């Protein structure tokens, strides 16, 4: 009964179903084991291959050692001649091998290209669908429709990228499949664990059911009891438990079936994952093979590139060495030519001497036919002639001696350079002493200023006395007129009484009465027309010191006299004895409250002077730091006493008699001894002016050394005249105390202060040196033909300022000084003087204002150059040695400026180079008005004036012109070298590469076309700016476009993101308009527009052709992209165009070698115009049919 209730449960199916996942795991394990074994086998093969490689290398090394040993034995065994022959044979073999290698490389390149094409065709056929559009696009973009090697490489690169992307996708799918397999294995293990747990529970429950049944049977048998109520109850409970267990077993079976189905699905998915993994591995192996092939090809290409780069670098080094050797040979050739010229000159001189001697010999032979003594002399002379011939024959030996002397001079130059290095310490010590002396001189200047201010107050107090003196003078003149009228009346009465005509006595009166009383006073010239007061004073004659008061210039009297004062006395010229008194009178009159100058005038004047002193001090400090020569010069001049020499010169020399009216009527009052006006000899023009202005000429008076002494034969003075004479003496003493020729005197003007003055004159400072030198230069030879030039205040007079206050001056004072310097230059140019006739201040003003030389060079020229003749005759070595200009470009700047001024100011200059008035130059106002009214007719004049006036100086070139060309990176080099518009056409390639650091050939080409643009505009800066403004908003006149304007045009096309690439690229309007070989592809390359962006390139091509056709004279060839026609040579292109902007007159006017373009067809171009490939850069693309590809560095 128990057997019927509890049937057996078959577990065979369950066990069979549980074996499936274990078998799947076993298969996976077997697969992993096979993969590991395969990996180990591959590693073993790799190790074997590495071992074989190591053994091969070892064997190769041993063979190399054997080869070296055999070569040594062979070299020992063979004789020397055979070795030389073998060397030559080896050289020939090496050359032959090099040629064969080149041929093999070319063949390999061709084979590689063919193999690459075949491989590409295979790959394209394999991946035709993915690469079809790319190939079509690339063939459409290429001009000729033929894919080149670069296109093949690009296609290979895209193919490799495609394979790489496929490999990544396969790897991603493999990784996902492996992750899914791992998850399924985990689920399988969990299900297996659950089944095991269920089996254990079933086994436990079965054992539990059997044990209670056995126990119940035993109890019944033991007790002998039958089946009662307890057994029925127990069976019912067991049946319920059995039903429950059957239900649970059914549920477990259902769950097991579900797990089996899931297991089968997992196995299927695992199989598919294994298949996909195999496919992925196959694809990966193929991709790895392709990648290895591509890497091998890439390594081959890199090796070829490295060999080409090495060959290029070696060629470049050889080229540089050849250039250096060429430069050395050129220098040696120039030196040999100079020596040869010197020898020719000497031989020519010897030949002339020989001819002269032969002529003299013939003359002596004719004269000495009968004289034996003369024959002896002739024999001696013949012997001397023979000696001369021998000397002439030994001329080559003398040349050798000269060469040896040249070598000795070079050695001396080296020793001098060593001495220059050793003198640096000496310069430092000298700078300390100079600083000390400058501080001491500054203190003395401050004391001097205080004393001058006290003297100024005394002058103001004396001005009232001067007014009183004027009143007394007026009264005296009235008394004189009354006395003269009485004398005439009395004489007429006497004549009437005696019966003589009055005219004869009136005519002889100046020679009778007055000449007897005042015999030493010079008389007036006959026929001079005088004013009433002039006539009275003329009759009275000059009475000693009063001549200084009566002979003051009329213009100064007119400026200083107040309204309602007396008419001025007659104008005359001061003699040497009365100049100091006249200066004192003029200074007091101009500084008096009644005049138009007061204390502020003197303060401003002192400020200007002290500012000039400080400027000179700074310039001296900069000079003494540069070269040994300037330091020695400073030392010698600082140790000298400039003020003593100045005082000695002024005390020993007398002034010439011609002190012009324009000199005394200068804008600034003569406040110091250094403002002594310039002197000039009398000229007919000035005599005519004097006659027109009623100015009588007088003879020169006593020298300066007579001082304020009154002649002893003057008439006995009246009390009023004695008082006037005492006031005149006091005024003369005060004027002498305020003179700037020496240090300040006491405020009282006493004799003690006069005796103390020589002690203060020995100030050993650079101030005294400068003032002494400049005073000597000013008082020197008055050899000038123009009175107006002589009366113009010079630069040294205005800049030399012994008592100025530099810190108190404003910009107005600098403007005044610049205006005075401009007046100097304009006066010199208005007179039409040649450059050699210019004086030192004019030359210094020209250097500072028109040439634009730095302050230290201007100071050096001021110290060393005293006239235009000295400046014009300076050679290159003298400029370097005397002025201290060591930079060759600075010397070039100075030489070109000197050549220009010498040519433009020479009397032989053509009429076209002069203005309508016949002068070479005009003032700034005249130039601006002329250029505003008659611009087209006077282009040559404005060009030359602009160059000469310095409007296109180095600051304009560095700050304006270079940025407009798109080359602002070279600004600092151009500014350091002071490159101005004159120098642009004279810069050669060596200077551009070396000193200006312009290594890029395209940048040099860009600079050349910028210079051509300036040539076509005749270097007219205003015309350039005007045309740029006019073409700012329109597409016209592209030649004057700047780099910024070109960038704006590119931005306006919608290519703003590429426009910034033109910064510092050298692209400007002149390059676009004048370079026939520059096309849109070059511009696209500089803009860095990618070749894939076909739309932007087409837009650029269209707009570029429109720009060239509308804004330039160029004409683009429509079939240029198809026919690949070569552009015309730059030599043919520039021969005709360079001469458009230069007329024959302007070419004749220029000095030799000044404008190479005016001489015709680029006489000596400073740089090659070919567009060479920039150094260190390979071309980005190549064209078929041998077309050269230009590349521009950007």
Swiss-Prot record:
Keywords: Coiled coil, Cytoplasm, Cytoplasmic vesicle, Phosphoprotein, Repeat. Residues 651-666, 1157-1169 have a biased composition (Low complexity). GO terms for cellular component: acrosomal vesicle; cytosol; epididymosome; glutamatergic synapse; presynaptic active zone; presynaptic active zone cytoplasmic component. The modification Phosphothreonine is found at residues 714, 792. One of its GO terms (biological process) is neurotransmitter secretion. Residues 1-23, 202-233, 525-583, 624-819, 1157-1194 are annotated as: Disordered. It holds the Pfam family SAM_1. Its main location: cytoplasm. Predominantly expressed in brain. Also detected in sperm (at protein level). It comes from the Eukaryota. The keyword Cytoplasm applies. PROSITE patterns: SAM_DOMAIN. InterPro entries: Liprin, Liprin-alpha_SAM_rpt_1, Liprin-alpha_SAM_rpt_2, Liprin-alpha_SAM_rpt_3, SAM, SAM/pointed_sf. Residues 785-797 have a biased composition (Polar residues). Residues 202-217, 548-559, 624-636, 687-701 have a biased composition (Basic and acidic residues). It is found in: Cytoplasm; Cytoplasmic vesicle, Secretory vesicle, Acrosome. Residues 838-904, 953-1017, 1041-1110 form the SAM domain. Residues 26-133, 161-501, 596-644, 1014-1040 form a coiled coil. The N-terminal coiled coil regions mediate homodimerization preferentially and heterodimerization type alpha/alpha. The C-terminal, non-coiled coil regions mediate heterodimerization type alpha/beta and interaction with PTPRD, PTPRF and PTPRS. Forms homodimers and heterodimers with liprins-alpha and liprins-beta. Interacts with the second PTPase domain of PTPRD, PTPRF and PTPRS. Binds RIMS1, RIMS2, RIMS3 and RIMS4. May regulate the disassembly of focal adhesions. May localize receptor-like tyrosine phosphatases type 2A at specific sites on the plasma membrane, possibly regulating their interaction with the extracellular environment and their association with substrates. Belongs to the liprin family. Liprin-alpha subfamily. This is Liprin-alpha-3.
